[in-house]
C-alpha cells in the first residue's frame, strides 16, 4: 500500500498490521500524551478491538507489544499506513 496521508488511525481496520507515519500537523491541538505514550513515527501497531458506539480503540504497538486504549478523538491526529501486502 502506498503512503496515503489521508489514512488516520481512527479509521484503520482491526487486525491489520500498520505503521505510524506521523501526525496531523494542521491541528495544533494534538495531545502531547500521544507522543509520551510511545506512539512515535515508524512504530508498528495493530488495532485489536474497538469498543461499541465508536468507543476507544484497543491498540497493541511497539516491539514490547504494549497495549493501550486510545480515544477516537486522539486517534484522529495519527497518520498511518498498512504494512500488510
Show where each model-derived region lies.
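Short alpha-helix capping/helix-loop boundary micro-motifs
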Residues: 29-33
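A residue-level detector for short acidic-glycine micro-motifs
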Residues: 11, 22, 47-49
Amino acid at each position: 500500500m502506498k503512503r496515503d496521508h489521508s489514512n488516520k488511525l481512527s479509521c484503520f481496520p482491526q487486525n491489520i498490521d500498520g505503521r505510524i507515519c506521523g501526525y496531523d500537523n494542521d491541528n495544533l491541538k494534538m495531545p502531547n500524551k500521544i507522543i509520551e505514550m510511545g506512539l512515535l513515527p515508524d512504530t508498528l501497531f495493530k488495532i485489536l478491538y474497538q469498543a461499541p458506539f465508536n468507543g476507544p480503540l484497543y491498540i497493541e504497538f511497539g516491539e514490547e507489544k504494549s497495549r493501550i486504549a486510545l480515544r477516537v478523538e486522539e486517534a484522529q491526529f495519527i497518520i498511518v499506513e498498512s504494512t500488510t501486502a
